[in-house]
């Protein structure tokens, strides 16, 4: 009889524990609801320019959110409720609010990352639950992505390029939760990586983009720049050639190819391309200047003084104030006189 009684007591105890954790989840929901009410009131007061009262309402919202966070943290760490999608649904709502409003940032500095993780867990734990709430959850995912974009822009403007890159990668990975590929986010990350000389990261990002089927002139350009910076010259040339095959008229790729071949002292392979660009861009003297530099270089297999002078004269026709063209012409005549 004692064993039966003990079993009944244990079952009752376990039931009470389970109810307690469910209660914490309900508490979190209610505290968050109260916080949202305070936020809405604060926003209305701000429209009326009643900033002091708005600040008080936001402080009340912060208190409610702090309680909501404490309650949902308990539910998220309990063996029974942590395996339920609803727990992580509430968790994501609360933490997204903390991440979105600067007034609540000190409640958790990693709130945005935790929101993304919670949204990911919803799908992992219960795909049917996600489908039932797909509209709402997709909105949260979009909000997280937007937050990452905003954080990335702020980090970039402040010169923290590594953080900016991470933010845009996080934006991409957040959209991937629902099977979407935000390749524009990775493109921004790749561009910043090239600018910041984070060349291995740039190569990794461009590889992902190409694997995703996202082929643009910029992807090939960034890949080539990063490979060249690491002295992977064969890879640099390979990606430039692939890019030119797919986008033969893209001037940025053409210019990158010209720079690459000049760097490798393979100007004979690119001279026709440079001349074509010079004839095409009749108001831009830079291509004739490059031609003049190549033809005027005694170490080049294309060394030709008359062609060099002709090209520099073309530069002066287009831009009479180009001092370097005059200097180089003078240098050629000095060399000839010696």
Give, region by region, the residue ranges found by the protein language model:
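TPR alpha-solenoid repeat register
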Residues: 87, 132, 180-181, 185, ...
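Canonical positions in the second alpha-helix
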Residues: 75, 122, 171, 208-209, ...
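N-terminal leader/linker segments that initiate helical-solenoid repeat arrays
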Residues: 19-136, 140-143, 158
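Residue-level recognition of tetratricopeptide repeat
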Residues: 82-84, 129, 178, 182, ...
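Canonical tetratricopeptide repeat
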Residues: 90, 184-191, 222-225, 256, ...
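Structural marker of alpha-solenoid helical repeat scaffolds
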Residues: 78, 125, 174-178, 212, ...
